[in-house]
Amino acid sequence: MILAVGVAILITLSGCGQYVPGTYTEEKSFEDIMSGPDINVSLSGDQNSGSTPKALEDLQIHHIDVGDGSSTLVIAPNGETMLIDSGPREANGSEVISYLEEVNVSRIDHLVATNPDPSHIGGHAAVIHHFETNHDGIGQAYGSGVSTSSETYTEYTSALREHDLARYNVASGYQLPFGAETRVAVINPPRTGTDSNGPETNSVALSIHYDDFTYLITSDAGRQAERRMANQYPDQINADVYQVGNHGESTSSTDLFFEMVAPSATIISSGQNGEHGSPSREVMQRLESTGVETYWTATHGDTVIISNGTDFQVRTQMNHTTDAGEIGSISIGATEMVVPAGQVDTRRPHTELGL
């Protein structure tokens, strides 16, 4: 796999630190990417530009570019793996399986379905069949307990039964077992019973902690769920990196919630032609107003967060601005990628990426 790397940039999270615009280097191999410097953020306030996370010694969070959907691979420092969602039904898990093969994942210890929408579990059945047949299988599966009658959901549950896999319904207050060093807290759906507003409100939301580093993923949880999480888990939602809710749609990342999350970097997972116009101008303006670094899989491609618990780095498949205002100015309806003036589109299709 070829990923694009930037120079090392160090900031503090003390409230006064800011990113300094950096220049970009030549494209590098996957091995170079995973061992070399990139955007380096200190969580402790101690500037240590020599601190470079290494594969399987740190927490890795891979945002796989699946188009109009979401799929996130988390690798714990001990090598344990968690796949959160698998992208849209149209792709049938092909991009996810290809990516997992490229990064040498032979077993998925934890498979999470944040909600039964096809943009999140579209590849679950294919991923289960592939790893149960060709590799070391799937450990355990987790979901919100909300079901649908869709063909995609039926295929997913059929695959679970076919391969005799256990599935656990989780709720706020639960913790998922994920290595000795990493804590994965479930903060949605409510433990008192699923909300009547449907699958999105009941999306599984996870707060992932590794020492001083916190990552927040809320799937499609909307305003009502965000209010509840803000009231019940104010410390859990405060995060260094936030995967923007509902692919950047205006139904999520509300003002108060985003203010309490207070991230240093945000990731938006959606396609260039988002089904519901994601990311929305409202959300992009909110991100722009805070100056937070923003990464969009439609413009940055596969995006990897690496943290040693003190610092975190952001590595992207493609060089692109991280200014939310500039990203928000891209035409959502464009049929081809719009590249800002002075930048070159170096994206490569998955079929041309190799280790």
Residue ranges and their predicted role:
Residues 1-14:
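Sec-dependent bacterial lipoprotein signal peptides
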Residues 13-355:
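Non-globular, low-confidence helical/coil segments that flank catalytic cores
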